[in-house]
A protein has these predicted regions:
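Phosphate-end processing signature that detects enzymes handling 5′-triphosphorylated RNA
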Residues: 126-145, 154-156
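Non-heme Fe(II)/2-oxoglutarate
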Residues: 1-73
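Membrane-proximal basic amphipathic "stem/tether" segments
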Residues: 171-220
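Short, conserved beta-strand element in jelly-roll/cupin
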Residues: 83, 100-116
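Short beta-strand His + acidic residue motifs that chelate non-heme Fe in jelly-roll/DSBH
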Residues: 91-93, 117-119, 136-137, 141-149
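Conserved short histidine dyad/triad with adjacent acidic residue
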Residues: 81-100
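A short beta-strand-loop-beta hairpin characteristic of the jelly-roll/cupin
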Residues: 110-129
Length: 220
């Protein structure tokens, strides 16, 4: 089992609703995920439905959005369509928005895909089929490339982990806690590297931290 990508339901969304969604989204004016085109440039596009818990004007355009809202027994932070165009590539990376240990999880529902999509999580290729529901822990290294000739469109949601969400996932085991420890260690090393690269002496940094804490504790 891949700890970073877990198949939750095989038939989460019916084919008729998938086809309806493809018709509804056909004329949407896609926007780049990153305005500065940091990842994949114009090859990675988005259609936001919920942003920071708030529905966008796009939400009521799609019947699928309402179905998802009814199905999910948890808080949805973000809900969006992501389109990876042919030739698009997002290099290996990790982020904490979907780290179960930090209280978040990212869920994917493929709307349209093709056999030449190469989605890799924790160094293992993950093949997602249309209509399935997948849980992705984004704290594991992941990447995606679309070598096919069709767009790869997923409905993606960031949710807050609660008891209902936890029941969708395998029980936490020693590997889970070792992974969290690994992330903390990586964060510490990155933190340390940042300050040493700025020629900031450790004792000076600790002095700044001490004064900041003292200020917060004793300010009136």
């Amino acid at each position: 089992m891949n700890p970073g990508a877990i198949l939750v339901f095989e038939n989460f969304i019916e084919k008729d609703l998938i086809n309806k969604t493809l018709e509804e989204i056909k004329n949407y004016d896609w926007k780049p995920v990153w305005a500065n085109k940091r990842y994949a440039g114009d090859f990675w596009m988005t259609c936001p439905l919920i942003e920071d818990f708030t529905k966008t004007p796009n939400f009521n355009t799609f019947a699928l959005a309402k179905v998802i809202e009814e199905k999910m027994q948890c808080k949805i932070v973000n809900l969006m369509f992501y389109a990876m165009l042919p030739g698009g590539n997002i290099p290996p990376h990790r982020d904490m928005v979907g780290n179960v240990g930090f209280g978040g999880l990212r869920l994917h529902v493929p709307i349209i895909t093709n056999p030449k999509v190469n989605f890799v999580v924790a160094r293992k290729r993950v093949i997602m089929s249309t209509g399935e529901l997948w849980a992705l822990d984004t704290s594991y290294t992941h990447s995606v490339s679309n070598y096919g000739e069709e767009n790869r469109i997923h409905l993606v949601m960031d949710v807050i982990v609660n008891d209902w969400v936890l029941k969708l996932l395998p029980p936490k085991n020693i590997k889970f806690y070792l992974h969290q420890f690994h992330l903390i260690l990586l964060g510490f090393l990155k933190f340390f590297k940042y300050f040493t690269s700025k020629d900031l002496k450790l004792k000076d940094f600790l002095h700044v931290v001490y004064n900041s804490i003292k200020l917060k504790l004793f300010k009136k």
